[in-house]
Amino acid sequence: MARKELSALNIQTGPLGSDAADIIAPAAKHGLRVQNIARSFGDRQVVRDVSLNVQRGEVFGLLGPNGAGKTTCFYMITGLIPADSGSIWLDNEDITQLPMYQRARMGLGYLAQEASIFRGMSVEQNVRSVVELRHKSETTIREETNRLLEELRIDHLRNAPATALSGGERRRVEIARALAGKPSFMLLDEPFAGIDPLAIADIRQVIRYLSGQGIGVLITDHNVRETLDIIDRVSIMTSGAVLFEGTAQEAVESAEVRNAYLGEMYG
């Protein structure tokens, strides 16, 4: 399926391409669905009636300027903070009131911006420690650990201490740990933060790998260019509400989005 060039940025849409994004029904009953969620802190409403829908195999971006409410919205989806109103669904299951660990058991993986690996362990031990939570057989644990190390291309680092990893290598280990939980969706909080340009390209490959495995990916990041490069669709938030939803190409071409968020350098 052909991908549409994002001529203004010299980038391309994500692995599904905009044609695939066009056929994703907004009212689909499957996938990760967020319906009219809202959140206030005291008298200040920071998220107002936000809705979005992410399908398996799709890479979806949640973007916006500082103070737009995207981080609060993202945290409500992960279960880090509760929503005041609205609902969050994982396929046909209402997970709105479930704590974060139960959402994870149901297939909602989360990669925090902050480092989440065990610094006192090797790469292999970091991955194995999560695999052991799901399996009891030593053979299965060993095979699953090896599979994740190989698929995330960190097998050569298996004996390296976590403290010796670069930013990109650490991200790969963290994603391998998250994949050990067999998620159907992955929420990536600032995946491009704190890593160099070469590592950014590396993480983009990992995100494409996740999508290719049929895992839905929801990204929030301040690195606009890199995020638009990888996503299939995007919601742009301003002042606590969704200003725009569409493909990356459509976002770049939108005068409304440029005026509120991207700026004229994207025009």
Task: Name every feature range the model reports, one short phrase each.
Residues 63-65:
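The feature captures the beta-strand-to-loop junction immediately N-terminal to the Walker
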Residues 82, 94-114, 138-142, 212, ...:
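ABC ATPase NBD coupling module
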Residues 139-157, 204-208:
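Conserved ABC ATPase "signature" region
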Residues 161-165, 169:
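Conserved ABC ATPase signature
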Residues 182:
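Conserved catalytic motifs of ABC-family nucleotide-binding domains
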Residues 186-190:
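Catalytic Walker B motif of ABC-type/P-loop ATPase nucleotide-binding domains
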